[in-house]
């Protein structure tokens, strides 16, 4: 594809890193944009955007704002990136808050969890915005027709959960989406919905719990398989399946 990349950051360090990689044939597609500041992971995202005007995250978003780039990809401070995008690019009409969408493997494909941590205390109206954005994103990127949207809750029955969840449920019923009701945690990976919405506090806990549990399962398997030569032989024969499952559950593939 005809894609160009602008690396934003300390130009000297970026170029040193590029020198140790084989970029032959890509030189014309790669440029550097110097940024003198960095948002550290322990900083407040919103404050960093206001105070560090020349941070790599702020400058990268500025490039999109000025029409010099079409998108930003970052492994940096999530809160700072969301804040910078919201302040500099604004949100879509009818959408008040940005939400973090994370594609997660499930039976028969993937589902989208939104919000994964951008808003820990949103209003029910914000959650409806997440549902609309998530539905459009899933249909556009993953495909497969109109996405089913479920509300993460402690049970599937209507009327379950906190007052916040009940308010979200009522508004989602009226939203221009295919809302299928509440979804309890044990039903998510059965892909009862293509899009699962929740507040960022709940979503982030869910993501990190799943990540930690997946790693623990592989640790337990390793201990059990090392109990006998016969088990180790069986594990060797099934190594391809283990590798495939490990890759599917890796946060390197799906985020977390």
Task: For each feature predicted by the language model, list its residue ranges.
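Glycine-rich phosphate/nucleotide-binding loop
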Residues: 6, 86-99, 106-113, 192-196, ...
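General beta-strand structural signal in soluble alpha/beta enzymes
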Residues: 7-9, 32-34, 71-75, 114, ...
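Phosphate/nucleotide-donor binding subsite
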Residues: 23-69
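Short glycine-rich anion-binding loops that position phosphate/pyrophosphate groups of nucleotides
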Residues: 37-38, 77-79, 87, 154-157, ...
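Glycine/threonine-rich beta-strand-loop-alpha-helix active-site module
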Residues: 70, 76-126, 130
């Amino acid at each position: 594809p005809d894609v160009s990349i602008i690396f934003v950051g300390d130009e000297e360090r970026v170029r040193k890193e590029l020198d140790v990689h084989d970029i032959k044939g890509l030189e014309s597609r790669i440029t550097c944009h110097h940024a003198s500041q960095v948002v550290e992971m322990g900083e407040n995202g919103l404050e960093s955007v206001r105070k560090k005007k020349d941070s790599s995250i702020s400058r990268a978003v500025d490039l999109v704002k000025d029409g010099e780039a079409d998108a930003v990809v970052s492994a940096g401070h999530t809160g700072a990136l969301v804040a910078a995008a919201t302040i500099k690019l604004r949100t879509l009409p009818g959408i008040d808050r940005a939400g973090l969408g994370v594609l997660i493997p499930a039976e028969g494909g993937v589902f989208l969890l939104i919000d994964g941590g951008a808003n820990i205390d949103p209003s029910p109206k914000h959650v409806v915005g997440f549902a609309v954005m998530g539905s459009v994103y899933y249909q556009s990127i993953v495909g497969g027709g109109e996405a089913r949207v479920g509300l993460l809750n402690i049970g599937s029955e209507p009327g379950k959960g906190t007052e916040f969840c009940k308010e979200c449920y009522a508004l989602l019923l009226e939203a221009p989406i295919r809302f299928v009701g509440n979804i309890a945690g044990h039903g998510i990976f059965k892909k009862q919905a293509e899009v699962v919405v929740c507040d960022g506090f709940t979503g982030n806990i869910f993501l990190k719990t799943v990540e930690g549990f997946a790693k623990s399962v592989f640790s337990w398997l390793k201990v059990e398989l090392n109990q006998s030569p016969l088990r180790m032989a069986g594990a060797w024969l099934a190594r391809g399946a283990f590798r495939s499952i490990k890759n599917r559950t890796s946060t390197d593939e799906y985020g977390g």
